[in-house]
Amino acid sequence: MKIELTVNGLKIQAQYQNEEIENVHKPLLHMLAALQTVNPQRRTVVFLCAPPGTGKSTLTTFWEYLAQQDPELPAIQTLPMDGFHHYNSWLDAHQLRPFKGAPETFDVAKLTENLRQVVEGDCTWPQYDRQKHDPVEDALHVTAPLVIVEGNWLLLDDEKWLELASFCDFSIFIHAPAQILRERLISRKIAGGLTRQVAEAFYARTDGPNVERVLMNSRQANLIVEMTEEGRYHFTS
């Protein structure tokens, strides 16, 4: 299936194999829907954690689309973690802008408070503006009975991040070999206009350490999905 999706405000051309849709994505969504029916009066919160380059933002947007097409599924809403980046002014004051995207560049306390509001009822959620390169407050109105919070650090085995677990009903981790992610991330930067030399330097400084940290320091998820070199997804056996 070829489909145009709006991901973080940008139009993305995505493609998923029909076999993968039937054997991975639809069964996974029905499993999450079953979780939601256990306590339908309460919002179900799913964490999707993955290293950079695994296509998680596009994937969750595609899941939203699949849920809209299936009357047996509840409405699903994606809540990206990127809206909890510290503002550039804060990053500059702390000399952290070159490392934007690392755990230290996120406002974990703010994320924790927002997750508490998500569990309790209708609320808003910030979104990262990729033109301004800063968060926009109250950009999303959270209304769906099933939400998927996606980001790199949701399962980080670090004291500051452990409190997030109390708001999570089910967690999914997308795994892929670091070398595959390296090539995907460098290619993405080149497609954005950078030379290969600059793209490789960016990977070495920012994306590479983040990939390794997610792969090596994330806590065990309830479900692991593997991404292949071709960008396809399958359940681990």
Swiss-Prot record:
Keywords: ATP-binding, Kinase, Nucleotide-binding, Transferase. One of its GO terms (molecular function) is ATP binding. It comes from the Bacteria. ATP binds at A50, P51, P52, G53, T54, G55, K56, S57. The keyword Secreted does not apply. The keyword Nucleotidyltransferase does not apply. SUPFAM superfamilies: P-loop containing nucleoside triphosphate hydrolases. NCBIfam families: PRK09270.1-1, PRK09270.1-4. PANTHER family: URIDINE KINASE. This is Uncharacterized protein YggC. It comes from Escherichia coli (strain K12). The lineage of its organism: Bacteria, Pseudomonadati, Pseudomonadota, Gammaproteobacteria, Enterobacterales.
